[in-house]
Amino acid sequence: MLDPFSEKAKELLKGFGSINDFMDAIPKIVSVDDVIERIRVVKNEKLIDKFLDQDNVMDLAQFYALLGALSYSPYGIELELVKKANLIIYSERLKRKKEIKPEEISIDVSTAIEFPTEDVRKIERVYGKIPEYTMKISDFLDLVPDEKLANYYIYEGRVYLKREDLIRIWSKAFERNVERGVNMLYEIRDELPEFYRKVLGEIQAFAEEEFGRKFGEIQGGKLRPEFFPPCIKNALKGVPQGIRNYAITVLLTSFLSYARICPNPPRRNVRVKDCIKDIRVITEEILPIIIEAANRCSPPLFEDQPNEIKNIWYHLGFGYTANPSLEDSGNSTWYFPPNCEKIRANAPQLCTPDKHCKYIRNPLTYYLRRLYLEGRRNAPKRGNKRGKKELLHQ
């Protein structure tokens, strides 16, 4: 298989039923050791040969096992390792394939079959050889926005690509699809078998061994509003009657509390008191932001619904009360932030996607992604035990 996100791969997955069914079946198809062997190509590319002619089901099972593991830690060195290892494997398969058929990869390309007669010689002179593939300019710029179109032959709204161009642009789509796949599984991670947590542990152990230090998950801490998703920023500005309760009590309360206290919870039934020791984190850091946003609503939420503050505490997991103690945590469910689909359905006015939204399915993973990218941008370029640059900078 050339691409685990291709139509061919999707057809194979359909044979298992739903994605949940496939994820349940994976532990019966591959072992943890099988899966971890796949990421070892990052350390030793000589291992790649064993993955080049793999059975399609085995290949998909190993790949999705890694994505399932990442659903518990969606942004960090683990993601970079999984991306890099699989790019090595699938890129090599593409390079060795005599003819890449458009339906075998996950980007929308066509075989280049027509050229204006007067352009053929010019194309050969300028580009060295006749391009083999074409794609829409809009799709091209979406994947490689910094590329100069002047470096490519353009005809009737399509960019013409040589084989090496195709593989390079495909790699950008592949990385994006990996993140999308992880975010999809993030929504069902509480339903996944324990197998995937074991895979994650082995990925983290490999990273620690390879890079000489332990990589932890993103922890709770001071909120970074500049990295909030658009829906949260819109809710903070205040909203009109009709979506006030959803925007403030459901969305903002859940997002701010998890983002500040437990941005990457180990499970969905976690309680506030499992994560903090002082309720003032809520009363002094989170609640004032919620109240300010509620007061910006039209009309202000608490003017005509003063008891809604009790509902906010209820959604934080303290039960329906106005003055809880930390020990009351667990009297109700600490609501997890709704996913993007639910936000669009209940409060479409809040959903104004930006360029980062294309990767995610939940506002909390948006925040995790932005924090991760900022950390990667500011990380010092330190060498690992073998004198290589850290993977984060490769």
Curated annotation (Swiss-Prot):
Example of a GO biological process term: DNA replication, synthesis of primer
Names of the cofactor(s): [4Fe-4S] cluster
Domain of life, source organism: Archaea
SUPFAM superfamilies associated with the record: PriB N-terminal domain-like
Single annotated GO MF: DNA-directed RNA polymerase activity
Transmembrane portions of the chain: none
Record: residues binding [4Fe-4S] cluster: 231, 340, 351, 357
GO cellular component, one term: primosome complex
UniProt xrefs under InterPro entries: DNA_primase_lsu_euk/arc, DNA_primase_lsu_PriL
Keywords: 4Fe-4S, DNA replication, Iron, Iron-sulfur, Metal-binding, Primosome
Annotated cofactor note: Binds 1 [4Fe-4S] cluster.
Subunit-level organization: Heterodimer of a small subunit (PriS) and a large subunit (PriL).
Function recorded in the entry: Regulatory subunit of DNA primase, an RNA polymerase that catalyzes the synthesis of short RNA molecules used as primers for DNA polymerase during DNA replication. Stabilizes and modulates the activity of the small subunit, increasing the rate of DNA synthesis, and conferring RNA synthesis capability. The DNA polymerase activity may enable DNA primase to also catalyze primer extension after primer synthesis. May also play a role in DNA repair.
Family in the record: Belongs to the eukaryotic-type primase large subunit family.
Protein name: DNA primase large subunit PriL
Native species: Pyrococcus horikoshii (strain ATCC 700860 / DSM 12428 / JCM 9974 / NBRC 100139 / OT-3)
Primary gene name: priL
